[in-house]
Curated annotation (Swiss-Prot):
Keywords: Autophagy, Cytoplasm, Protein transport, Transport, Ubl conjugation pathway. Signal peptide: none annotated. This is Autophagy-related protein 3. One of its GO terms (cellular component) is phagophore assembly site. Residues 242-293 are annotated as: Handle region. Monomer. Interacts with ATG8 through an intermediate thioester bond through the C-terminal Gly of ATG8. Also interacts with the 40 amino acid C-terminal region of the E1-like ATG7 enzyme. Also interacts with the ATG12-ATG5 conjugate. InterPro entries: Atg3/Atg10. One of its GO terms (molecular function) is Atg8-family ligase activity. It is found in: Cytoplasm. It holds the Pfam family Autophagy_act_C. It comes from Vanderwaltozyma polyspora (strain ATCC 22028 / DSM 70294 / BCRC 21397 / CBS 2163 / NBRC 10782 / NRRL Y-8283 / UCD 57-17). E2 conjugating enzyme required for the cytoplasm to vacuole transport (Cvt) and autophagy. Required for selective autophagic degradation of the nucleus (nucleophagy) as well as for mitophagy which contributes to regulate mitochondrial quantity and quality by eliminating the mitochondria to a basal level to fulfill cellular energy requirements and preventing excess ROS production. Responsible for the E2-like covalent binding of phosphatidylethanolamine to the C-terminal Gly of ATG8. Residues 83-164 are annotated as: Flexible region.
Length: 318
């Protein structure tokens, strides 16, 4: 509880910045968080913003009806420890890829080998998802292929999940995403219920956190955006920005390489100089992850922390 109290004070005391440093730091501003939340709700309508009710504690740097995102009653049929083990060498490759400059190992979104084996996880693939409305692009056209990037970073994503039991261990989770002022990134909270709708204890909720993360990134906390006391397990965001920054760099390299290959294959005619200048500018934009796509990628990594929670249970194409 001491860690939870310190975290709450840190959130309260940290000043809010509205200067965007997303491309250089991997952090986002409150305005970018709102944009990312709108994009998530548009792409996946099972996510929604909070209602501006009397039970909500408002923070003045966010709109009253956009304090946090929520998806309710998400199924969870198996405990985290029941997932199939995969090769620890994959996790080692990823850890080595996100070392601090001083040589220390970062622990956010980390897939560590350690004493416990790494777990397989659900995949939220970024392709083949079409938002509602006309004249829109698919996720595969608007976002980088995160599965390819994760593979290049040495992270394995398997579908070798054990068979789902016949609802004897069925649970449900309400998932919340809010903005962390101290880390300037999204922060996830989960609140669990058993099959009959009774709240889970914190100890029971920890059963659905991957063992490698229970002591590193998961904390028992009161939901900070409700006036009533509701116990939850939070996923600590201490290194999210660093991992996002690494992804940004990798996206830049991968997409530029692909563009160069396409240019070589289709070098039949050259555009005029004015077109060249505009194309270079457009390519620079296309070579990056946009800030409003942050939460799509964020949820991709959260599945490694909560492998049994079916984040994609109504989201065809994830």
């Amino acid at each position: 509880m001491l860690r939870s109290t310190l975290s709450s004070w840190r959130e309260y005391l940290t000043p809010v910045s509205h200067k965007s440093t997303f491309l250089s730091s991997g952090q986002i501003t409150p305005d970018e968080f709102v944009q990312a939340g709108d994009y998530l709700c548009h792409m996946f309508p099972t996510w929604e913003w909070n209602k501006a009710g009397n039970d909500v504690l408002f923070r003045n740097f966010l709109p009253e009806d956009k304090q946090f995102l929520v998806m309710r009653k998400v199924p969870c049929n198996v405990r985290a420890k029941q997932f199939v083990n995969i090769d620890d060498s994959a996790s080692e490759a990823f850890v080595q890829g996100i070392n601090d400059e001083d040589g220390s190992i970062e622990n956010g979104w980390m897939i560590g080998g350690g004493e416990t084996d790494h777990l397989s996880k659900h995949s939220l693939s970024s392709g083949d998802v079409t938002p509602s409305g006309n004249n829109t692009k698919t996720m595969d056209e608007t976002t980088p292929d995160i599965d390819d990037l994760m593979e290049s970073m040495g992270i394995e994503d398997t579908d070798d999940i054990i068979d789902t039991p016949q609802n004897t261990d069925r649970r449900y989770y309400d998932l919340y995403i809010t903005y962390s002022t101290s880390y300037k990134v999204p922060k996830m909270y989960i609140v669990g219920f058993n099959g009959s709708g009774s709240p889970l204890t914190p100890e029971e909720m920890f059963e659905d956190i991957a063992p490698d993360y229970r002591s590193k990134t998961a904390t028992i906390e009161k939901l900070p955006f409700y006036k009533n006391t509701i116990s939850s397990v939070s996923i600590h965001p201490c290194k999210h920005a660093n991992v996002m920054r690494i992804l940004l760099d990798k996206v830049l390299v991968v997409k530029r390489r692909r563009r160069e290959e396409m240019s070589e294959n289709h070098n039949e005619h050259k555009p005029n100089p004015e077109s060249d200048e505009w194309e270079d500018l457009q390519n620079d934009v296309d070579d990056t992850i946009r800030a409003d796509q942050y939460l799509i990628i964020f949820l991709k990594f959260i599945t490694s922390v909560t492998p049994g929670i079916e984040h994609d249970y109504t989201m065809e194409g994830w």
